[in-house]
Amino acid sequence: MAGAASPDHLFGLRNSFYVGAYQAVITGVQAIPARAALSPDALAERDSLLYRSYIAIGSHQLVIDEIGPGAATPLQAVRLLTVYLSGGAGGKESAIRKLNELLADDAVGSNPILRLVAGTVLMHERDYAGALKHTNSGGTMELLAMNVQICLQMHRSDHAEKQLRIMQQLDEDHTLTQLANAWVDLVMGGSKIQEAHLIFQDLSEKYPATCLILNGKALCLMHMGNFEDAEGLLLESLNKDAKDAETLANLVVCSLNLGKSASRYLNQLKLAHPDHMLVKRMSSAEDSFDRACQAIS
């Protein structure tokens, strides 16, 4: 009789990470029993989940300090992501250059975490075609989910739907498949908004109420015109993380639709995330208004 399959000690960590329960990942890593015989690949995945969670909560220096130059490729990639996110223009350029060197190395260039980090960095750079170059071949559910995000950013919902169908064929019940389905539904609009809301509601019953889940539910309510209930969810999210970019951005939009002042949330967003797309759009609108005033003065 065949032996029982060994338990997947990273299953819970992955799902916690996917829904934005980063502290649960950090504490969950400590809870993995010492006797668990993790393979080298599993150890690298465990550590990448851990350090990516630290990045998500803003502990950039810890990641930079703990990942040494001799670390495995996935961890080197995660460290470069930290350098990119925490550094100025020089740090960003250095991180991108070193990422490109790793990607060009035939021995490690196909590593999925490396490709995922490359996609993440290039999405931040708004180089969506470049990001897709590294993620399009897939290989993991995370890479496929990133393909969906990139296609939606490129306003190619048709391609996003194709990527979603691949995910559904692989594992329809996977947490990332459910999230990707909700993202596509939100963009499609109409009756799909209710379907997206049901997905986020289901996730909220399975997992802690994270900023990601609360923002997802709030976005659905905003699409349905229910800004008051959306505001309540967003304020709950703000209590969990006062600097969360999407929470602040959605509160700006929600407040404006409720006829309330959004200046405090916008100022917080400018301070914490000066490169956020909403900040840039608002700044561009202000500049256009100023130029128009000067033209008629």
From Swiss-Prot:
Subcellular location: Cytoplasm; Golgi apparatus membrane; Cytoplasmic vesicle, COPI-coated vesicle membrane
Pfam family, one: Coatomer_E
One Gene Ontology cellular component annotation held by this UniProt entry: Golgi membrane
Domain of life: Eukaryota
Protein name: Coatomer subunit epsilon-2
Family: Belongs to the COPE family.
A GO molecular function held by the record: structural molecule activity
Membrane-topology descriptor: Peripheral membrane protein
The species this protein was found in: Oryza sativa subsp. japonica (Rice)
Lineage of producing organism: Eukaryota, Viridiplantae, Streptophyta, Embryophyta, Tracheophyta
GO biological process: endoplasmic reticulum to Golgi vesicle-mediated transport; intra-Golgi vesicle-mediated transport; protein transport; retrograde vesicle-mediated transport, Golgi to endoplasmic reticulum
This protein's UniProt keywords: Cytoplasm, Cytoplasmic vesicle, ER-Golgi transport, Golgi apparatus, Membrane, Protein transport, Transport
Biological function: The coatomer is a cytosolic protein complex that binds to dilysine motifs and reversibly associates with Golgi non-clathrin-coated vesicles, which further mediate biosynthetic protein transport from the ER, via the Golgi up to the trans Golgi network. The coatomer complex is required for budding from Golgi membranes, and is essential for the retrograde Golgi-to-ER transport of dilysine-tagged proteins.
InterPro entries in the record: Coatomer_esu, TPR-like_helical_dom_sf
Signal peptide extent: none
Quaternary data: Oligomeric complex that consists of at least the alpha, beta, beta', gamma, delta, epsilon and zeta subunits.
